[in-house]
């Protein structure tokens, strides 16, 4: 082999090695980017969840840096020794010390084998021993963001869901004021849904999201979530609950924005569709009452509109068209006989007068 051929062969070997190193580095980088890895063989959901906050509004996760405070630094020389030290503190019921030791390990040796274990132990100590559910969930999110492939992903997302339920049930208050906002709880539920869209508890979680929207008087957004439940999980029992609650939210909007006849018409159609789809629904009497209320309101509004056209300021032709439209859309109205009589009267008028 000539020197020229040897150099060419060496260049090819170096090129292949460089490509392999770049691919390895890229794979490692993807593991540390939030959302790059679903973990647990469970694909992330798309961001197409109407009624959820936009993920772009959330702050992107960042790795925790080693603390410059000496008392928050690792007490041992290696991650293995530090993790063993944290477990010793936990066994001695020094939970605050154990949590700090786990945190220090993750900060100092983020790429170590012990880091995911320490991060999980950190989150569970916060939840179980210190009952700091908000911070525990935040640390669990950190585990998902940076160590998704290094943990039992689906099992821990379900644990996170239970954590948010506990967070919501045990909201701490001070003189009636809560330290935890509905928005934060809702966003935690939304995160759970996005991380495990195929989990069995997701429809239930979405009901909770919509419920919180209603508590905050965000009925437009609540309706979107209820619609998403019906679209994504049509065969689940939660869809019946979502249908009733959507009807209730729509009625709230109709009463609040009664001038919007298009909305009233859409809600009337939704009520009829829901009653037809679920003839044995428990809230049937309530749905019927809402439909009757809505039809009565729309009937009166249409009657007043037709009457407004039947005046000296309008032509007989316009009045005739208004009454015909009213009768077509509201044939069972209490004002139907009056409308028919007026149509007959206007139709019998001289053609010249009617065509003005």
Q: What is the meaning of each model-derived region?
A:
Residues 3-9, 15, 26-356:
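Acidic, polar-rich low-complexity tracts and alpha-helical solenoid repeat scaffolds
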Residues 13-21:
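Sec-dependent N-terminal signal peptides
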